[in-house]
């Protein structure tokens, strides 16, 4: 059936419309786009002209569309042609009222502005709050990737009505930033016909076209209506006119003529008949989002069929059949380096002292090169030093730049651009300001010196403001340009007449095409002939060395085997066969240095020749198998070959060497056997082989308890890390009815041998100490996974304790803690132990009146002759360390004194961080400049001066721990004189009773037999029965029936055993532990118990009432009592170690915190120590009282690493 006339005419009209459209799609005008962001290019006029040049008649922008700094009354109508932007669209800092992006359909968002936005409209207003009013992007229907940002556009109308979820992908809606302000001017409302009142401006034509949110559920992408039959093909973007892939307004991925496709047609197809890849006649290259038959000029083709600006690292660029292609390198490629702004130089503005080394041996630069004034000044903000001019020679290997070359600064003492003397081609695939591929501005040079430059493929040239520059106007630039549209802008340089007056003109040997400088090697081309790169008057044809011949106006050296002729040519061409006369011998047509002798010839036969009197080589007789000296058999050598005798001699020498080697080996083995037998005999006879070298050091007689796994019970996990797990539990010694709260540290199954060694080293140190103020090891269990059993400190670390109770801590507590820490450190010094990690976090609180030093993971035991310890590395607490420890890794007892001063400062500031806000890498420099921690508000100058003495640069000038004990003991007797705390006399700390406390702590009901570890290890009178079945030895045994009975000191055998050790059960409620100490009495273990508190110091009249409830309670009750006896509200802190001034309080659940109970876990530098690892435990305390232990944000602990890192070497 024939179609009607009307239908046929319509069909012809449709075909006529489609054909031009198809051609138009293939021939769309493409432009590169810009990446200037908010940079202004010159004046407003220059900036606008640059924008106009880049986007005039442009339809597809391959990069970014940046419209910035456009002033009022500028005509932006050239932007109407833009339909597609591959990168982002930035509209910022404009005062023009209307930006007509009326035909923009899609923003692909292949690049983002500020890492998030595909469309950014920012600050388009002037001082009068007038500016951008209309942004009619009525055809914008899709943004494939990226979010949208509007900010500070007070005059912009109607945009707030747009339904962006129809345009932006749902993946990016959460990143949208919309700041629409109240309009100062009047805005016309949207046309009533607009759907949901959404429009880009007044009038029906500016209504928003919805192609997504109105679609039926059956549609997977865009649509042209609400019906299921209106769905667009899934290859369409921004809408469609029909259901097919050829009906798309814009293609989502690639456009092949009028059809949208997922990929472009491949260049090669597999032929199943021939089992080979054949050329696809329909194959096309992918260029942006378009399939093209041929890549645009100045682009290269990859093996994958893409048009790219530069080849990859494993390929090189070459021209084949008129097409520039990327070919895989055979072996190593010539070195291609990224340019400024790409890859590792993404954030660099210029070549500088820190990045120029990356250009070493580079032959091709993929991108641009900038040399700006900041390179030679240095940049204090980025800590970049000034560039050494000598390092510019690194760039002499560069032969190609794919982008542009910008030079705005150069060394004053260099007269030309010497670093680019080998540069051959500037491709200009990216241009400065979208225009220039070579820019040399404001330099002090006299000549360019680009003597190897042969091509500038694209882009203009600007050479301006170089007051001493000559020769630039002599160059025939058009011969270097790749296109006819390229231009030069050579202005404001030295005048031509001034150059001639000083003789700065091209050399006489240069041709009229100009020169790059004054030397013959600077000529663009030579007037006569050239030798290498240098122009010469003539070649060495008849005289001179070396002799040459002429080829294409170039002097070529004759072959070395050509004999120089007098007043005649030496050779006629290249190679040894073009010589007029040979220098040595003639072998056929060739000149050779010697006649062939034993050279492999045809049929695997050796060729031998001799030279006649005329120095001509002839073949030897066939029977002369080892050469000859003349023709015939008589020319053969009579002595026979020399090779067999040489071979025989070599074999004999090798056999002789072998025999000698065997003899030496047997002799050495015999000596070893004799020595071994002698050593065995001496050992059997128990004779000393070496002389005695006694050290004079006392033997370490510390006891190490080996516990069985059945003797302790794990109750609850305190924490875990890389080393293993820490439990709180009970130690129940075999055969004894006591329970001792302990912390159990268990290594993992797969723990490394190094971790096992380190934990045993720590066990050695902890087992070697025995002092009331040093945390000790109770025992070790050698199961398949090593387990350490240590004391359980109820109140956690002192740092957290002072932070939590800062409102209840009085001066007496603070000074007593200082005394106790000094006592513990003095004990460690006497035991030759350097702690290396003293800080408030490493002091544990047994009771509010009793603290102990812990964390021996870094402690080192000095030998008998050692005065200091040199560390090799690892994490160290920089902000607590002495200066010599930071700089030279030297640790002594006096470096511990420095740490003690910082620890005291922590206590006096109630847990403040030392040097807070100062990076650890800068601590050494500020200490060397004399800066120290400030005086805490509560400290008098007496206390602060002690801290300052601890921080002296000279280690010998710091006080000893013995002296610190005396100083702080004196202050502890009159605390309110030295520490000023508001409400000091009303402050008190909780001190729960043992049974209730441990029951709450251990979550156990049956805690009647609970005993503190110290009391078990040093038992008092009648405390235990110590049956004979106990396998755990006790030091002594005492018995006390009551507090008011007469006490006898009795050992296990029933004998009187006195005196009582310090901090013993009987002295638990003794007076001030500091006592009336002198330097001579510091080390006395047994001190007499004073009858009254602070009896050596007059009592303060106000607020200093002492609590005698348990202090020095007499063995027989006195008839009269102090009026404050058993006063629960007394504020006395007379006994600095053991106070019980308040009723028992509930145990805070903070005791479940691993940070408080884990005893610092294993002190290896690993996850097991929270002070050395961030985010190991949660930080905050919940309102219900359950405490989540704070992780140590210890930037103070740094491992050896580069300066840019948070870790620095110990």
From Swiss-Prot:
Q: What is the effect of changing residue 719 to S?
A: Found in a lung cancer sample; somatic mutation; strongly increased kinase activity; constitutively activated kinase with higher levels of basal autophosphorylation; more sensitive to gefitinib than wild-type
Q: Superkingdom of this entry's organism?
A: Eukaryota
Region annotation Important for dimerization, phosphorylation and activation: where it falls in the sequence: 688-704
**Tissue specificity of this protein:** Ubiquitously expressed. Isoform 2 is also expressed in ovarian cancers.
Segments traversing the membrane: 646-668
Q: Which GO terms describe its molecular function?
A: actin filament binding; ATP binding; ATPase binding; cadherin binding; chromatin binding; double-stranded DNA binding; enzyme binding; epidermal growth factor binding
Subcellular location field: Cell membrane; Endoplasmic reticulum membrane; Golgi apparatus membrane; Nucleus membrane
**Positions of ATP binding:** 718-726, 745, 790-791, 855
Name of the protein this chain belongs to? Epidermal growth factor receptor
Q: Which organism does this record belong to?
A: Homo sapiens
Gene designation per UniProt: EGFR
């Amino acid at each position: 059936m024939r179609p009607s006339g009307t239908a046929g005419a319509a069909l012809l009209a449709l075909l006529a419309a489609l054909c031009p459209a198809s051609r138009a799609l293939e021939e769309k005008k493409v432009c590169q786009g810009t990446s200037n962001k908010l940079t202004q290019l010159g004046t407003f006029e220059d900036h606008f002209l640059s924008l106009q040049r880049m986007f005039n008649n442009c339809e597809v922008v391959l990069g970014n569309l940046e419209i910035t700094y456009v002033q009022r009354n500028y005509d932006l109508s050239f932007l109407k042609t833009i339909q597609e932007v591959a990168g982002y669209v930035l509209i910022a800092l404009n005062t023009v009222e209307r930006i007509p992006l009326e035909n923009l359909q899609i923003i692909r968002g292949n690049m983002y502005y500020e890492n998030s936005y595909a469309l950014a409209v920012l600050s388009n207003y002037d001082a009068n709050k007038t500016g951008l009013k209309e942004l009619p992007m009525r055809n914008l229907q899709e943004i494939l990737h990226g979010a949208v940002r509007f900010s500070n556009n007070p005059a912009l109308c109607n945009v707030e009505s747009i339904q962006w979820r129809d345009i932006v992908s749902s993946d990016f809606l959460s990143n949208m930033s919309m700041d629409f302000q109240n309009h100062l001017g009047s805005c016309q409302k949207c046309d009533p016909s607009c759907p949901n009142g959404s429009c880009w401006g007044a009038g029906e034509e500016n209504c928003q076209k919805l192609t997504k949110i109105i679609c039926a559920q059956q549609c997977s992408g865009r649509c042209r209506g609400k019906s299921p039959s209106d769905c667009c093909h899934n290859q369409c973007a921004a809408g469609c006119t029909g259901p097919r892939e050829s009906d798309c307004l814009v293609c989502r991925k690639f456009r092949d003529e009028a059809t949208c496709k997922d990929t472009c047609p491949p260049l090669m197809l597999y032929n199943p008949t021939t089992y080979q890849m054949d050329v696809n006649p329909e194959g096309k290259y992918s260029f942006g989002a378009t399939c093209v038959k041929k890549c645009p000029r100045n682009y290269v083709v990859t093996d994958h069929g893409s048009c790219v600006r530069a080849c990859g690292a494993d390929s090189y660029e070459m021209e084949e059949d008129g097409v520039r292609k990327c070919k895989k390198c055979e072996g190593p490629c010539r070195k291609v380096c990224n340019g400024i702004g790409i890859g590792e130089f993404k954030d660099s503005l210029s070549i500088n002292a820190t990045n120029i080394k990356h250009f070493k041996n580079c032959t091709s630069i993929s991108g641009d090169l900038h040399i700006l004034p900041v390179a030679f000044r240095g940049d204090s903000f980025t800590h970049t030093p000034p560039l050494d001019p000598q390092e510019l020679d690194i760039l002499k290997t560069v032969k190609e730049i794919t982008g542009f070359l910008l030079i705005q600064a150069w060394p004053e003492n260099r007269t030309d651009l010497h670093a680019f003397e080998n540069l051959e081609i500037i491709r200009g695939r990216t241009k400065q300001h979208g225009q220039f591929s070579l820019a040399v501005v404001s330099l002090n040079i006299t000549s360019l010196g680009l003597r190897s430059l042969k091509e500038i493929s694209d882009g203009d040239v600007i050479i301006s403001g170089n007051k001493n520059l000559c020769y630039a106007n002599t160059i025939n630039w058009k011969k270097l340009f790749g296109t006819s549209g390229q231009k030069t802008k050579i202005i404001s340089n030295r005048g031509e007449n001034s150059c001639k007056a000083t003789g700065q003109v091209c050399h006489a040997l240069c041709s009229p095409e100009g020169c790059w400088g004054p030397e013959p090697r600077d000529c663009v081309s030579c007037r006569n002939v050239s030798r290498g790169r240098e122009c010469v008057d003539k070649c060495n044809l008849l005289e001179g060395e070396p002799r040459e011949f002429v080829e294409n106006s170039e002097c070529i050296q004759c072959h070395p085997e050509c004999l120089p002729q007098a007043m005649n040519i030496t050779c006629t061409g290249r190679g040894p066969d073009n010589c007029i006369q040979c220098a040595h011998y003639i072998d056929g047509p060739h000149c050779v240095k010697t006649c062939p002798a034993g050279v492999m010839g045809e049929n695997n036969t050796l060729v031998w020749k001799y030279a006649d009197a005329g120095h001509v080589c002839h073949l030897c007789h066939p029977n002369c198998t080892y050469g000859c000296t003349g023709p015939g058999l008589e020319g053969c050598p009579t002595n026979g070959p020399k090779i067999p005798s040489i071979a025989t001699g070599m074999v004999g020498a090798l056999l002789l060497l072998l025999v000698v080697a065997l003899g030496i080996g047997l002799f050495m083995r015999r000596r070893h056997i004799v020595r071994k037998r002698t050593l065995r005999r001496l050992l059997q006879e128990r004779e000393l082989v070496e002389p005695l070298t006694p050290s004079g050091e006392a033997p370490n007689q510390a006891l190490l308890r080996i516990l069985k796994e059945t003797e302790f019970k794990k109750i609850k996990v305190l924490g875990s890390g890389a080393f293993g797990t820490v439990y709180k539990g009970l130690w129940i010694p075999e055969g004894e009815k006591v329970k001792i709260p302990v912390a159990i540290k268990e290594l993992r199954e797969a723990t490394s041998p190094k971790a096992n060694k380190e934990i045993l080293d720590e066990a050695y140190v902890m087992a070697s100490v025995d002092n009331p103020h040093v945390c000790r090891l109770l025992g070790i269990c050698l199961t398949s996974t090593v387990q350490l059993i240590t004391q359980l400190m109820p109140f956690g670390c002192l740092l957290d304790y002072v932070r939590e109770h800062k409102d209840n801590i009085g001066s007496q507590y603070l000074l007593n803690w200082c005394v106790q820490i000094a006592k513990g450190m003095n004990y460690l010094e006497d035991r030759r132990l350097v702690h290396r990690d003293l800080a408030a976090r490493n002091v544990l609180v047994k009771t509010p009146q009793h603290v102990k030093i812990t964390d021996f993971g870094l402690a080192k035991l000095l030998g008998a002759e050692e005065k200091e310890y040199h560390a090799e590395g690892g994490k160290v607490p920089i902000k607590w360390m002495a200066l010599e420890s930071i700089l030279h890794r030297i640790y002594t007892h006096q470096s511990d004194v420095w740490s003690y001063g910082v620890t005291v400062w922590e206590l006096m500031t109630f847990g403040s961080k030392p040097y807070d806000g100062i990076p650890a890498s800068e601590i050494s420099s500020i200490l060397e400049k004399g800066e120290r921690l400030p005086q805490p508000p509560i400290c008098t100058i007496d206390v602060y001066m002690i801290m300052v003495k601890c921080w002296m640069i000279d280690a010998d000038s710091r006080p000893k721990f013995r002296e610190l004990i005396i100083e702080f003991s004196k202050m502890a007797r009159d605390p309110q004189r030295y520490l000023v705390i508001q409400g000091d006399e009303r402050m008190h700390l909780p001190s729960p009773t043992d049974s209730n406390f441990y029951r709450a702590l251990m979550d156990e009901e049956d805690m009647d037999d609970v005993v503190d570890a110290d009391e078990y290890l040093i038992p008092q009178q009648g405390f235990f029965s110590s049956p004979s079945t106990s396998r755990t030895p006790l030091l002594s045994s005492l018995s006390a029936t009551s507090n008011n009975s007469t006490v006898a000191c009795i050992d296990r055998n029933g004998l009187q055993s006195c005196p009582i050790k310090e901090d013993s059960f009987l002295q638990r409620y003794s007076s001030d532990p500091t006592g009336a100490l002198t330097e001579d009495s510091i080390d006395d273990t047994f001190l007499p118990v004073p009858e009254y508190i602070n009896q050596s110091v007059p009592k303060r009249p106000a607020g200093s009432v002492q609590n005698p409830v348990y202090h020095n309670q007499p063995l027989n009750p006195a008839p009269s009592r102090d009026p404050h006896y058993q006063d629960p509200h007394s504020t006395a802190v007379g006994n600095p170690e053991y106070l019980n001034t308040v009723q028992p309080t509930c145990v805070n659940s903070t005791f479940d915190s691993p940070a408080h109970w884990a005893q610092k876990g294993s002190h290896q530098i690993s996850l097991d120590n929270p002070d050395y690892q961030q985010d190991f435990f949660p930080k905050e305390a919940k309102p219900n009282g359950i405490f989540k232990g704070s992780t140590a944000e210890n930037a103070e602990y740094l491992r050896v690493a580069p300066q840019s890192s948070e870790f620095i070497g110990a």
